[in-house]
From Swiss-Prot:
BP GO annotations: photosynthesis
Subunit structure, interactors included: The 4 large subunits of the cytochrome b6-f complex are cytochrome b6, subunit IV (17 kDa polypeptide, PetD), cytochrome f and the Rieske protein, while the 4 small subunits are PetG, PetL, PetM and PetN. The complex functions as a dimer.
Main location: plastid
UniProt topology in membrane: Single-pass membrane protein
Family statement drawn from the similarity comment of this UniProt entry: Belongs to the PetL family.
InterPro entries: Cyt_b6/f_cplx_su6
Assigned keywords, A-Z: Chloroplast, Electron transport, Membrane, Photosynthesis, Plastid, Thylakoid, Transmembrane, Transmembrane helix, Transport
Role according to the record: Component of the cytochrome b6-f complex, which mediates electron transfer between photosystem II (PSII) and photosystem I (PSI), cyclic electron flow around PSI, and state transitions. PetL is important for photoautotrophic growth as well as for electron transfer efficiency and stability of the cytochrome b6-f complex.
Gene Ontology cellular component terms for the protein in this record: chloroplast thylakoid membrane; cytochrome b6f complex
Transmembrane segments: 4-24
Name of the protein: Cytochrome b6-f complex subunit 6
Organism from which the protein derives: Tupiella akineta (Green alga)
Gene designation per UniProt: petL
Length: 31
């Protein structure tokens, strides 16, 4: 149970980092 929660939180953090990096890349391309 604890490992599942930690895995989900890790996956969520990875998704957030990936989305932020994607938005930054799009802004660089627009400029």
């Amino acid at each position: 149970m604890v490992t599942l929660i930690s895995y989900i939180s890790l996956l969520a953090g990875f998704v957030i980092i990936a989305s932020v990096f994607y938005l930054a890349l799009v802004k660089i391309k627009l400029i």
